[in-house]
Amino acid sequence: MYRIGLGYDIHKLVEGRELIIGGVKITHEKGLLGHSDADVLIHAIIDGMLGALALDDIGTIFPDTDPKYKDIDSTVLLKHVYDLIKSKGYSIVNIDSNIIAQAPKMMPYIPKMKTRLCEMLGIENHQLSIKAKTKENLDSVGQKLAIEANAVVLLEKE
């Protein structure tokens, strides 16, 4: 049996925070505002994984009202959700994702993101797609006020 899930996340860019996307530190003058490290790509992947199994979303499982998640590394959350899907007898077939940002340019960082995420999720490079898009100067992302990501996750019952 196959299950598919769609994940999405957006965070505001602010001064005084590191920019972490896909578990990789990105050189930029601003970072993403959030209760955790605000890693939009990992959050989108997590929501896609949870959605594929019709489970609660990331905000319900890791509420921003819980101090134990304050500034937490999103890779810790991803590992928890990965272990959850494995415990339910599922494995990842593939993940297709987009990072949407006007700035900074993501392409130089994507190979490192893929390596990091593939290692964490026990998948091969050909099972994970990370693409970089812009908003052509439109909306909050296009005006460099935010960064968003989406991900489609396909799971298979083992």
What residues fall within each predicted segment?
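Short, surface-exposed, polar/charged, turn-prone segments marking secondary-structure boundaries
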Residues: 32, 48-49, 121-127, 156-158
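Short, conserved loop-to-beta-strand elements that form functional interface hotspots
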Residues: 96-101, 109-141
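C-terminal edge-of-domain segments
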Residues: 141-158
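Short beta-strand segments
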Residues: 7, 129-133, 154
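A glycine- and small-aliphatic-rich helix-loop capping segment at beta-alpha/alpha-beta transitions
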Residues: 18, 116, 144-148
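RNase III-family endoribonuclease catalytic core
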Residues: 2-111
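Mid-sequence acidic-hydrophobic segments that form the walls
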Residues: 84, 116, 120, 154
